[in-house]
Amino acid sequence: MTVTSRVPALIDYLVTLFTNDPTIGAATPPVTVYDGPPVTALNTPLTLYIGLTDPDSDAMESMAESQQTWAALGRRGRDEIVTIHCVAEAWSGSDSVQSQRVAAAGIVAAVETLMQADTTQFGGNILFPDPGMAVVAWSQNTTSTGAIARAAFDLVFKSRIGG
């Protein structure tokens, strides 16, 4: 089978990894992990979106980008740099933005720790994180339903596809 891109398999792997990890999806309290945009209107206090740039958008969102270059003699071997967009979000019914900012930072820290600790090449989908966690944009707000803090970040990987 020809592999056009590692993006779909890598997103699937990350969703499973984060959902089952004791510091994220299996934590107490758990972080709800979404593969892309949520399919429910329910707000969860701690959320990690994989393959999403803006949880508030009703428009189609970019989940990832990839760039390929030739990696070897011949036509088949290519290196692929994959960037997967993610958002960590913490929300509560209280007015304390500070506690939500700390909670969002905790989700990001747990993701970064997993990125550094993986020894499986992320299920065989990559050569290495390049650099792994990159470009974090922090935002916060206090709304009529409570305080919210977000950290939008990119996960960057290098993989080899083809021959």
Residue ranges of model-derived segments:
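Small/polar-rich, solvent-exposed N-terminal microdomains that initiate assembly or binding
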Residues: 1-73, 122-130
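Charge-dense, low-complexity intrinsically disordered segments
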Residues: 1-5, 98-102, 143-145
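Acidic-leaning, charged glycine-interspersed low-complexity segments
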Residues: 25-26, 104-162
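Generic short beta-strand segments
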Residues: 52-58, 89, 134-135, 156-158
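Short, charged, solvent-exposed linker or helix-capping segments at domain edges/interfaces
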Residues: 61-62, 97-99, 163
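Oligomerization/assembly interface segments of phage tail-like spikes and tubes
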Residues: 74-93, 146-161
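Extracellular/virion structural assembly segments
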Residues: 75-81, 89-117
